[in-house]
Amino acid sequence: MTGFEIVILVSLICVMAALYASVGHGGASGYLAIMALLGVSAALMRPSALILNVLVAALATIMFVRAGFFRWQLLWPFLITSIPCAFLAGAYSINEPTFKRLIAATLIIAAVRMFIPQRDAVIRPLPIPLAAVIGGLIGVLSGLVGIGGGILLTPLMILCRWATPREAAAVSAPFILLNSLAGLGGLLSIGFVVEPWLWWASAGAIVGGLIGSRWSIRSGSQLWLRRALGIVLLVAAFKFVITS
């Protein structure tokens, strides 16, 4: 990767991290989209996205906990199954065409998610057995693709009225953090490599994550940004579809 390409990559990662952190996400699906558009090899994408995810999700978790929005009782039913499933799936090696199709599907889901408005509603009790099943399924996808799973958990919690949008974001951040660490642990068991540009991308992700997390806590209109992000994700998904 040339110096100019690295500058472009880091800049885009920073912007993506800010956008995702503003809704309590780590941004792995966005990082995968950026790497796809810049032609990063599939072998590098999964570990790179997970590492960036850990950094941004950690910042978002700290911000939401300090702001008092985090609720442990909404998190643990998903975690008890998602962490082991993410670890096992992370250790599983899949062929490149299958990997690309899984990422394309994930990006499409993420894009659709960006166009769904967030509304407060009457909150229902969280059914623990169902949450455990959902957590396991999200964990498998997280480990296989290289995401934290928040892009799936957040809309589900809101649509099922298990949490307000802000509570869902506050729960998704640590969920993403721990799932990403589990996925990385699984990958580590089979070995992976990272490129030098990842350290610059990590710095960009940290800066973007700080900006986005602060913006989320202080609130602000995110609708047009979310829709623009949805379009970017759809473009990246299309690229994965035609190259798989």
Question: What spans do the regions from the language model cover?
Answer:
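Short hydrophobic/aromatic, small-residue-rich stretches within specific transmembrane helices
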Residues: 49-53, 172-176, 198-202
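Juxtamembrane transmembrane-helix boundary motif
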Residues: 1-22, 26, 30-42, 59-141, ...
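Transmembrane alpha-helices of multi-pass small-molecule transport proteins
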Residues: 48-63
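Small-residue hotspots at the loop-to-helix junctions and early N-terminal turns
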Residues: 42-47, 169, 173
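Hydrophobic alpha-helical transmembrane segments of multi-pass integral membrane proteins
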Residues: 167-184
